[in-house]
Amino acid sequence: MATSTSTEAKSASWWNYFFLYDGSKVKEEGDPTRAGICYFYPSQTLLDQQELLCGQIAGVVRCVSDISDSPPTLVRLRKLKFAIKVDGDYLWVLGCAVELPDVSCKRFLDQLVGFFNFYNGPVSLAYENCSQEELSTEWDTFIEQILKNTSDLHKIFNSLWNLDQTKVEPLLLLKAARILQTCQRSPHILAGCILYKGLIVSTQLPPSLTAKVLLHRTAPQEQRLPTGEDAPQEHGAALPPNVQIIPVFVTKEEAISLHEFPVEQMTRSLASPAGLQDGSAQHHPKGGSTSALKENATGHVESMAWTTPDPTSPDEACPDGRKENGCLSGHDLESIRPAGLHNSARGEVLGLSSSLGKELVFLQEELDLSEIHIPEAQEVEMASGHFAFLHVPVPDGRAPYCKASLSASSSLEPTPPEDTAISSLRPPSAPEMLTQHGAQEQLEDHPGHSSQAPIPRADPLPRRTRRPLLLPRLDPGQRGNKLPTGEQGLDEDVDGVCESHAAPGLECSSGSANCQGAGPSADGISSRLTPAESCMGLVRMNLYTHCVKGLVLSLLAEEPLLGDSAAIEEVYHSSLASLNGLEVHLKETLPRDEAASTSSTYNFTHYDRIQSLLMANLPQVATPQDRRFLQAVSLMHSEFAQLPALYEMTVRNASTAVYACCNPIQETYFQQLAPAARSSGFPNPQDGAFSLSGKAKQKLLKHGVNLL
């Protein structure tokens, strides 16, 4: 036992402690500290030592919080540093070696918390639904996988485990990207990634989600989440071979980013209702100008199923600014804050787990109505009246905005049924919107024109847009009603407190907001969020995984996928042949002996800050000179993180020098292994360290790194 413990401690010398502490179980003076310890790593630590460390850290956090009104995020001791994260009564703590950069230590802790929440949901509910022994086993699996796959460079940058793309044929990378794009055209699929032997081949996910999906292969087969295995059998969706679908939880910011794909990828949801087959080809392509829609003008506009046809004036259609006969008032739209802005919880609304939610992603754009005057609206009818646009002139000469209105089906009545809920907003006088330039603009009321939302102008780059999402909100007087057929599943965020995935009759104890609402589908999917889950800022989705030997296709999808056997079959058959071919080619083309590396006269490391990917030429077994290079990289990476204005530096000792440069999207480090001429140790124009910048720019070009 002593031998195994010392071996484990040696292999994880940089990862000393990790524990999860529940402060709600230690309230009184006589409550034992051990009662609040949910998990402690390493488990071989004596219980008395666990209590001592947990009690001291919890006391420090409480003391600092009382003094500064904010909990600490990092506590530095003489030989250890502790990254700290407070989540209500729960305390997450990761103890690392002092040599590890502060930013990496905090990122590792955030990553651990993200892993747990992704597969288990909110920590409070997870420990209510599962035993502590089961969750401890899962924690052990997570930590073991992290320590096994984290190299010296990965622990400095906390980067993802990616395949070295310089060793893969570009056509194979293109094929992997095409597989993901093909899967995206299937119903309910949002985005995904492809892994080979635990390494990233291609991904559409943001780095935070990609990191969580990377550990899925090591997760237990028997998922302990409710409806994880039973849901497919409940709904008659027999899973194909080597396919698994489990419920997962993403943050609201991650959910927004998953729905912010270009228009071309979202138009497939508009062609799903009957009668749209012929009109689906008329949607403007990605990158095209929205002004081309003027060619389809016919002088007629169809609104949503509950709107009145062709009102003669805004005042007649919407008297007193209220909704009558389905007309929407001037406060019917509000933009959701982009990911990372937490100053307004009331402005966050998500339409998830439904096709309507995906259609509404169309309606994204920053809009300043204070300078827009609409003397005469141009009316356009498209796709047999199922999607119509109103063109609005923009005074600054940019491409015109297009206002859009949806029609679920031409056969629906123009007036709403009794149980139809017409989405609207709370009535703030001037809701704020965040524009591309970072300035906040006031959205003024324009009665008669607020029932439509703008769609984005053509995006020059085929990437996810970063514009706010415009989604309707549920009218306070009609919270308990249901959406019409075809729009069920649009989960509303009532008063911005929590998302409504709960069955009618359930309430969320957060102020006066009720968490009632329509379920994600007509048949009532059993894996919907409970009020407690939704109020904790998590959104439930499905993770579809298809394993083909060493290749894994992982897709994040909306909740209805779990009960849609046709969609599952479509995803499976559309990707099966391509996945088999890709697996064979990767197996044949990748180097078999990774340890055999060609000798090089220099070391380099290139870190992509946006994708959190790393590229380097270091050998598997580091030499003493490589160790000095890693020490220099760790030091300079910390300096770049603490000093954003710093963009270039060189560090040296008596035997070697390391050059580094960075910008907002990347960091690059370079070391010449040959002994530098005239390395005198003090500034000298003839010192070899001053020529490292030019050598780095020249030699790294062949690796695809451009420092010019």
UniProtKB/Swiss-Prot annotation:
High-level lineage: Eukaryota, Metazoa, Chordata, Craniata, Vertebrata
Protein's name in the database: BLOC-3 complex member HPS4
Alphabetized UniProt keyword annotations: Albinism, Guanine-nucleotide releasing factor, Hermansky-Pudlak syndrome, Phosphoprotein
Domain of life the protein comes from: Eukaryota
Coiled-coil blocks: none
GO biological process, one term: protein stabilization
Compositionally biased region (Basic and acidic residues): 319-331
Known partners and oligomeric status: Component of the biogenesis of lysosome-related organelles complex-3 (or BLOC-3), a heterodimer of HPS1 and HPS4. HPS4 and the BLOC-3 complex interact with the GTP-bound form of RAB9A and RAB9B but not with the GDP-bound form of RAB9A and RAB9B. The BLOC-3 complex does not interact with RAB5A, RAB7A and RAB27A.
